[in-house]
Amino acid sequence: YAGLADKLHTDMHEVIGHASGQIEPGIGQPHETLKNYASALEEGRADLVALYYLMDQKLVDLGVMPSLEYGKASYDEYITKGLMVQLSRLKLGDNIEEAHMRNRQMIAKWAFEKGQKENVIEKKFENGKTYFVVNDYLKLRVLFGELLKELQRIKSQGDYKAGKALIENYGVKVDLALHKEVLERYKKLEMAPYQGFIQPKLIPVMKDGK
């Protein structure tokens, strides 16, 4: 399910994520009000718009995706990437600095913490390895909605203090033991932690002047 789920998440992140929401009258632009946290908060807001709608039956009714299993796959991947996989990009002991990485950990860590009482996301240990398992996708969707509401409020009202607290408390610091485990597990894959795109150089081939 992950292939289509990834594409839908990217589509909704860019189109209805960044394009949605309004700033209240008299409030400055985010780069003025939220300053150095504006980018991470905005990326998080756009991610949450996409995540919220990926578990909406309306997308199935419209024929955008065959079933909600695609939404579940997106939730699984987002939590795993946000809490673990992306740590493979950092050197042991480093904090998270990049905006997209900050927002992913912020969302995943916040949802994990807020859902602990109902075991929405469970931290498991099997054969010496750590796993994060989503136990209730609908409750996780509610949590995503709550955080989206707060991020929109922060942007709309230019609440620097609240925005800073979210990023600093959830998006910057890394669990050292977990980071060490991720680096050890990822090393065995012999894969680069980043993927890039190489744009083709197109050279027209002429034949009979065409």
Task: Label each PLM-derived region with a short phrase.
Residues A5-Q22, A46, L51:
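Active-site recognition of the HExxH zinc-binding catalytic motif
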Residues K123-K210:
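Non-catalytic terminal regions of proteins
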Residues A38, L51-I154:
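Long, well-structured alpha-helical subdomains associated
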Residues Y1-G3:
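Accessory "access/gating" subregions that flank catalytic or transport cores
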